Curated annotation (Swiss-Prot):
Name of this chain's protein: Probable nucleolar complex protein 14
Subunit structure: Component of the ribosomal small subunit (SSU) processome.
Keyword field contains Electron transport: no
Gene coding for it: nop14
Record-listed Phosphoserine modification sites: 190
Domain of life: Eukaryota
UniProt record, GO biological process: maturation of SSU-rRNA; ribosomal small subunit biogenesis
Functional summary from the UniProt entry: Involved in nucleolar processing of pre-18S ribosomal RNA. Has a role in the nuclear export of 40S pre-ribosomal subunit to the cytoplasm.
């Protein structure tokens, strides 16, 4: 191709050089060209590709080295696209045309798909197989020379017709044997027949069936005869039974008179085991169909109907209209039945005397998973608790009023005053029964209005519990049962009870603020402590933020840090709150600094001597420093710690109260170790406590024996925990990383460097791995590109096919419309 001149001149020059544009003028020069049509077409394609610069694509190299040719720098995307399109049309296009077609011609001839066999070998094997198939077909060929129609024997063998049956007259009949032998039965020789009969001739189906029937009848007759024989023997034994019994009775009497002891028969283990199985089967209760599982609404309706029926019977008995002595459904059974309906079981049972842990009375412990069980409380057995006191005086009921009878039905109260009127005259043990019956009769499934009634009743029940906690004496068993019902109602109506709890907390905070100004206002009171415990029993305490628990815990923490300690009873109340905090945080393990401060202050106040330099950094206001001499232990070696009641703190001797408070403090320290052991600041938290305990160990002669042992065990536990925390603590360090090389300005030269290498890693294994990864990546990309091209090709083919169908349909409809337009309606 010439490089000078225009594009048109260069094109003409290329055509002239390829002898494509010359045409002879005279006839002599019109000789037949030796070039074929394909050669001329190839030349045209070459000229077209050379002059079409848009059909070529060049890859610009980053570093161009003169005289160095690299494959892949120049490409022809149009040509490649055309080749790929043609290849897909031959492969994928053919498959698309064959889809949804089941018919095909499959060449199953021998060796057709085996390229290793020659044509002669294929033909020879096919011929041999054809001969084998033909020989099998001719095995029963009727066109053979020998006629073998009678028992596979030729007719020439049957040379005599004087066999039995052929000499009979026309009037005579053929017997079965003649028919069997001669009428297509074999035409066998008589000698052979005689031999077969001697050995055992072939029997017909009729003969076989006759023999089977005869044998069956024979066996049946034998069984019947044996059965009759057994019946006769049994009848004989029955007739002789009376004689045997009389003989045995006479023998027993004679042996008893003579003093002879009869030996009992020896029963083997197998017989004894068999007898036991038989007895179990005899006395085993037969299975009966059970009733279907009832819904909650049906159970509530059944229980409500039962209570109404019992109430009607009670009223009838009171009015002397009915005397039914069989109806004795007492309040205790009724309470158990209603508890089973709502899943209460036995309710919150009172804790055992050995399971009480400290000043926490554990009255409101529920089975909620967020609350803490009483067996995992944080104070030892010999600790303070709110001991159960009998409910006396006008705290609950009027002294002058007569004792009222317990009814079976009660209306749902709308106010606390109305609820108190319902309980008037009843014993405090019947209060949970009344609440249970109110909940049963006004179940939410029985009436649409019961939901609002029970929601209001839950608030009334909370008000009544708070009313009971303000009484001088209160039964812990009563609070347990009422708390159980309140917990169940809180699951149904959390919003209403949450608002009520928040209002109570707001009133507490106001009284707490007033107690800072007016010393005559005491906070916390016993009712406040019981309310704190009630909150932890009703609501989850492990949540980080809770609409009810969070304000309550803030109030408790403020009371621990700000409330004054004017007496040992105030110190005991603070330890009670600290115990509740540890119980609340037993699951979440959140650190509460007020708890550690309260424990440290209690240790400081009870120390026998004045401490000039207080170990640690816990908060110690001046008011406590002034009262240290008032609360200091003098000599309590004879005062063993015991369980205390919050109602009797003011009445106990000082030494006994000091001993019990110190024992409680040591238990709280041990429980705090278990909760806060994983804290990062565990060492800093408990080192001041360990220092205080070491000071107490110097004065252990002033303590009782049990208290001294508890002090040493607690000190050992604290010191061991601190040592373990020190061993687990790792000092701060910079982030570890591989050493970095010092940067150098000297250029790096590699021997054997080549531009063909894509990687210059000196590690051959890593280089090979990177090479395989690169190959896998390239192959994956190529496969994805191929799949996308195939998908586009299939889409184009389907569009073309659909376009052709639409065009054919439109053409057909157009022809029909033309015919209808020229159609004469008269015809």
């Amino acid at each position: 191709m010439g490089k000078n001149g225009s594009q048109l001149k260069n094109l003409k020059s290329s055509i002239r050089q390829a002898n494509l544009g010359t045409r002879p003028n005279n006839k002599k020069s019109r000789t037949r060209s030796t070039e074929s049509h394909e050669d001329r077409q190839a030349k045209v394609q070459k000229i077209q590709s050379d002059f079409n610069l848009f059909d070529r694509q060049f890859t610009k190299r980053k570093f161009d080295v003169g005289g160095r040719r690299v494959k892949g720098t120049e490409g022809k995307p149009g040509v490649s696209r055309g080749v790929g399109e043609e290849l897909r049309r031959r492969t994928i296009g053919a498959e698309l045309k064959k889809r949804n077609r089941s018919g095909a011609i499959i060449d199953r001839r021998f060796g057709e798909n085996n390229p290793h066999l020659s044509v002669e070998e294929k033909m020879l094997e096919r011929f041999s197989r054809e001969q084998q198939r033909r020989s099998k077909r001719e095995l029963y060929n009727l066109d053979a020379e020998d006629v073998l129609t009678h028992g596979n024997r030729p007719l020439s063998d049957i040379d005599s017709f004087e066999e039995p049956g052929f000499g009979l007259d026309e009037g005579e009949e053929l017997n079965d044997e003649v028919v069997r032998r001669m009428h297509f039965g074999g035409f066998e020789d008589s000698d052979a027949e005689n031999e077969k009969e001697g050995e055992g001739a072939h029997k017909s189906k009729r003969e076989v069936m006759s023999e089977i029937i005869a044998k069956s009848k024979h066996y049946k007759a034998e069984r019947q005869a044996e059965k009759e024989r057994y019946e006769d023997e049994r009848e004989k034994l029955d007739e002789q039974m009376e004689d045997l019994q009389s003989f045995l009775s006479d023998y027993k009497k004679a042996s008893r008179k003579s003093g002879i002891k009869t030996q009992r028969p020896i029963i083997s283990d197998g017989d004894a085991r068999y007898d036991s199985f038989v007895r179990e089967m005899v006395f085993d209760k037969r299975a009966h169909p059970t009733e279907r599982t009832k819904t909650e609404e049906e159970l509530a309706q059944i229980e409500a109907d039962r209570l109404r029926e019992l109430e009607d019977q009670r009223i009838s008995r009171m009015e002397h209209y009915q005397e039914d002595s069989a109806s004795e459904a007492g309040s205790i059974e009724d309470e158990q039945a209603t508890d089973n309906v709502f899943g209460f079981g036995k309710g919150l049972e009172q804790e055992n005397e050995e399971e009480w842990n400290g000043i926490n009375e554990e009255a409101e412990e529920s089975e909620d998973e967020e609350s803490v069980n009483s067996d995992t409380s944080f104070v030892d057995d010999e600790q303070l608790k709110v001991e159960e006191q009998p409910l006396v005086g006008s705290a609950i009921k009027n002294e002058g009023s007569e004792k009222a009878s317990l009814a079976y039905t009660y209306p749902c109260p709308t106010s606390h005053v109305e609820f108190v009127q319902l309980l008037k005259g009843l014993d405090y043990k019947d209060y949970p029964t009344v609440v249970s019956r109110i909940r049963t009769l006004h179940h939410v499934k029985l009436h649409p209005d019961n939901k609002s009634r029970l929601e209001n009743f839950s608030v009334i029940l909370l008000q009544h519990i708070l009313h009971l906690t303000r009484q001088p004496m209160i039964s812990m068993e009563l609070l347990e049962h009422l708390t159980e019902h309140l917990h169940s109602l809180a699951q149904q109506f959390p919003s209403a009870l949450g608002i009520s709890f928040i209002s109570v907390v707001e009133g507490m905070r106001k009284r707490l603020a007033k107690s800072y100004v007016y010393p005559e206002i005491k906070f916390p009171e016993i009712s406040d402590l019981l309310f704190f415990n009630l909150t932890g029993s009703i609501f989850p305490t492990s949540d980080k933020k809770h609409i009810v628990v969070s304000p309550v815990m803030l109030t408790m923490a403020e009371s621990l840090s700000q409330s004054p300690a004017d007496s040992l009873s105030d110190v005991c109340k603070k330890l009670y709150i600290a115990n509740l905090f540890l119980k609340f945080q037993s699951y979440s393990h959140r650190y509460v600094p007020e708890v550690i401060t309260a424990v440290s202050q209690a240790l400081y106040l009870l120390y026998p001597n004045f401490i000039s330099i207080v170990p640690g950094t816990f908060a110690l206001p001046d008011s406590l420093k002034e009262k240290q001499n008032l609360f200091a232990i003098q000599d309590i070696s004879l005062d063993e710690p015991q369980r205390l009641s919050l109602y009797e703190l003011e009445e106990l001797p000082t030494g006994l109260l000091q001993s019990s408070i110190l024992f409680i403090t040591l238990n709280l320290i041990e429980m705090a170790i278990d909760i806060y052991f994983k804290e990062q600041a565990f060492i800093e938290i408990f080192v001041p406590i360990m220092d205080m305990l070491q000071l107490y160990s110097l004065k252990k002669e002033l303590l009782s024996k049990r208290l001294s042992e508890k002090l040493l065990s607690t000190l050992q536990a604290v010191s061991d925990s601190i040592e373990s925390a020190k061993a687990n603590r790792k000092p701060l360090a910079l982030q570890s990383h591989r050493p970095l090389g010092i940067t150098s300005q000297v250029p790096k030269f590699e021997e054997g460097y080549s531009l063909d290498k894509s990687s210059h890693d000196i590690d051959p294994e890593r280089a090979q791995l990177n090479k395989l990864r690169a190959q896998h990546r390239d192959a994956k990309k190529g496969a994805i590109r191929t799949l996308r091209k195939d998908a586009r090709f299939i889409a184009r083919e389907r569009r073309q096919e659909q376009r052709a169908k639409d065009q054919a349909y439109n053409e057909k409809m157009r022809k029909l419309e033309n015919r209808l337009q020229h159609f004469d309606p008269a015809v």
